[in-house]
Swiss-Prot record:
Located on the platform of the 30S subunit, it bridges several disparate RNA helices of the 16S rRNA. Forms part of the Shine-Dalgarno cleft in the 70S ribosome. Transmembrane segments: none annotated. Belongs to the universal ribosomal protein uS11 family. This is Small ribosomal subunit protein uS11. GO terms for molecular function: rRNA binding; structural constituent of ribosome. InterPro entries: Ribosomal_uS11, Ribosomal_uS11_bac-type, Ribosomal_uS11_CS, Ribosomal_uS11_sf. Pfam families: Ribosomal_S11 (PF00411). Part of the 30S ribosomal subunit. Interacts with proteins S7 and S18. Binds to IF-3. The keyword Iron does not apply.
Amino acid sequence: MVKELIRVKKRVKKQILDGIAHIHASFNNTIISISDKKGNVLGWATSGGSGFRGSRKSTPFAAQVAVERCADIVKSYGIKNLEVMVKGPGPGRESSIRTLNTIGFRIINITDVTPIPHNGCRSPKKRRV
């Protein structure tokens, strides 16, 4: 019985210069995903997945660590320039943008894409504590 050798080609990562960083900063968590201009996600990270649990997950430092993890994943693609899309009112909003800048990405523009209702659904009732 003769065994055939199967050759697997190494997948070469494309070199992409420009990308889009989507930052979803909620009150409980911060989700960062970096994609190319077409919207294909290259890498993502969350503050919960970075080892933070409970109330520490919603801190600016947790968002900073998540951005650093996401940047390590995406650096292999050769991205230099980023457009930043920020969604949500969370505490990791500003620190994640600053971290992207200090890592070495050139930020082209920052856009706030937080959804704002034009008197849509009724908001939940106020908490009584």
